[in-house]
Amino acid sequence: MQAATVVINRRALRHNLQRLRELAPASKMVAVVKANAYGHGLLETARTLPDADAFGVARLEEALRLRAGGITKPVLLLEGFFDARDLPTISAQHFHTAVHNEEQLAALEEASLDEPVTVWMKLDTGMHRLGVRPEQAGAFYHRLTQCKNVRQPVNIVSHFARADEPKCGATEKQLAIFNTFCEGKPGQRSIAASGGILLWPQSHFDWVRPGIILYGVSPLEDRSTGADFGCQPVMSLTSSLIAVREHKAGEPVGYGGTWVSERDTRLGVVAMGYGDGYPRAAPSGTPVLVNGREVPIVGRVAMDMICVDLGPQAQDKAGDPVILWGEGLPVERIAEMTKVSAYELITRLTSRVAMKYVD
């Protein structure tokens, strides 16, 4: 009997990369594998994508794991380096790094390195989180061009704040700032992540940085799914029924008795709970698939178990397969039901969930 298991479909992952190349045919691909590849497994994901042009991570430790695992493609530190003492490692490993503040720039100017570092200057075009403000960017860029430790030319990167809101006007403003600053500069350019790839073809430039859409999940909050853009779900969260019980009309189930059956029925108990990372906030009615059939969660999600209403005529039995999200049940639907973003759902699964890779 299978307990909580994440099944990762390598074929779907490769399909999605190819689909994104079709959407941005003139751009190179930075496959973003931060946060353990959005919960899909850092090394296995990178090894599944030998055709990616580069990989993007948030921490130096992630980049080092890629190198130790045999990944030789360029690796971009999306948030840059956090300590000047890391620069020799970045140089020796040929990592690319974002540079977004005075402390990082000064560290580069003062370092003694055997080889220069490939730099992506981060321009704050409107996210207002990381990056050099436009009014300070000219002088900052000039110092990078004069720095002996920076491989020339300097590349330029930014990030959209509201790419998933095509009518708000913010993305057009960010693009205008980005284009104005990049004009006449020789380096590579990148501003589009998942939302930019899908909705803003004029933002694709030299490199795009697919994140959640690479894993077949829509970055938009408009009830779309990855399938709407030709992508396939890579992760399926699965488990099994561990019991099937007769349940009488008028009886509650679970902690607090929050759900009471209106009919005689059969309940299934699934080996899954918030101890595995499934959202405790999932309300009654949240769907799961049992033997490929959609049935509702009933009662509260517990640490280790979830109850589902199989229906009075159900023939399901202990040991039968359950899909909590993934193939046949998009995680975007679970996000909508639970009010927990799909980003959080797929990245917060706990260590007791087994990982299985299939082709």
Swiss-Prot record:
Q: What superkingdom heads the lineage?
A: Bacteria
Entry annotation: catalytic residues = K34 (proton acceptor), Y255 (proton acceptor)
- Quote the HAMAP family the UniProt record gives: Ala_racemase (MF_01201)
* Reported temperature dependence: Optimum temperature is 50 degrees Celsius.
Q: Which Gene3D superfamilies match?
A: Alanine racemase, Lyase, Ornithine Decarboxylase, Chain A, domain 1
Which pathway is it part of?
Answer: Amino-acid biosynthesis; D-alanine biosynthesis; D-alanine from L-alanine: step 1/1; Cell wall biogenesis; peptidoglycan biosynthesis
Catalytic reactions on record: L-alanine = D-alanine
Q: Which residues carry this modification: N6-(pyridoxal phosphate)lysine?
A: K34
Subunit info here reads:
Monomer but homodimer in the presence of the substrate.
Which residues of the sequence carry a binding annotation for substrate? R129, M303
Q: What is the protein's given name?
A: Alanine racemase, biosynthetic
Q: What does this protein do?
A: Catalyzes the interconversion of L-alanine and D-alanine.
